[in-house]
Structures are given as structure tokens and as C-alpha cells.
Amino acid sequence: MARYVTTVRTAKTPKEAFAYMADLRNFAEWDPGVKAVRQVEGSGGGPDSVFDVTVAGIGRDLTLRYETEEYDAPRNLLVVARSTVFTSIDRITVEPDGTGSVVTYDADLRLNGVLRVGDLGLRLMFGQIGDRAAAGLRRVLGAQVA
């Protein structure tokens, strides 16, 4: 299992930050590993939203179908994608902070079945991928110094 957690303090209100993060089509704006996002069901972020997220893979691109499993605006979002290779569990929480908010992105990537033997390599690679995504998230949310 590989896990990456980042927290960003922003001037955006909880409602603004949550709306931006819940619409997974925005992932391509801040995560350099995301090549494209297509909404399959719903309209923007919402409890019934489903997105196909295409990521740069090793040797070829991989499209993951993210389904919204928890949607509690403007505080909590859980989206999950399952493939034959791995399962991705992404939780986004937004907390009020003065006139702005604090956004926490918690990504958990798990190899499936016999592929779990590659967890150590996945952890190392996921840390680098997460660092690049976190930098992009700070940029788009207009991160403030804590």
C-alpha cells in the first residue's frame, strides 16, 4: 500500500474549495500525472458523479473509473477507483479556517492480488508522484503560509 497526504491552507471558502476539488475534471489542472478526465455520470461534483481519469502509466496510459462513495459538501468527499492492477482510494476533506479553509488530500493506492509484492516500489514512486501533485494543488488553490 502507498499513501500520500497533503494539506493546503487557502483563502478559498470551504464551499469554493470543496466545489473545485469535488469536480474531478479539475484534477488535470493540478496533478501532472493526470492526462485527461471525462465525466461519465452526473454534472460536476456530486453524490452520483463518476469520472474516467486517465493517468500516465509505466509504458502506457491507464484509465481509472472513479466513483463517488461519500459526498458531504462542503466537508468530505471519498472517491474510489478499482482496476485489475490496483485500487485507488482518495479522500478530500475541507475545514473552515478563518475566512478561508484547509484542504486535505489523502490518497491511498493499493496493488491488488499477487501484485502486492511490488508495494515497496509503489510506495517510493507514489511519494514522488504525490509531491508533484501537491505542488500543483498548492498552486491552484493559492496556498497561504500557515
Task: Name each model feature, range by range.
Residues 1-41, 146:
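Hydrophobic ligand-binding cavity/cleft-lining segments
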Residues 11, 30, 71-72, 97:
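A short, compositionally biased micro-patch
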Residues 21, 72, 92, 111, ...:
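Generic helix-packing signal
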Residues 38-86, 98, 102, 132-146:
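Glycine-rich portal/gate segments that line the openings of hydrophobic small-molecule binding cavities
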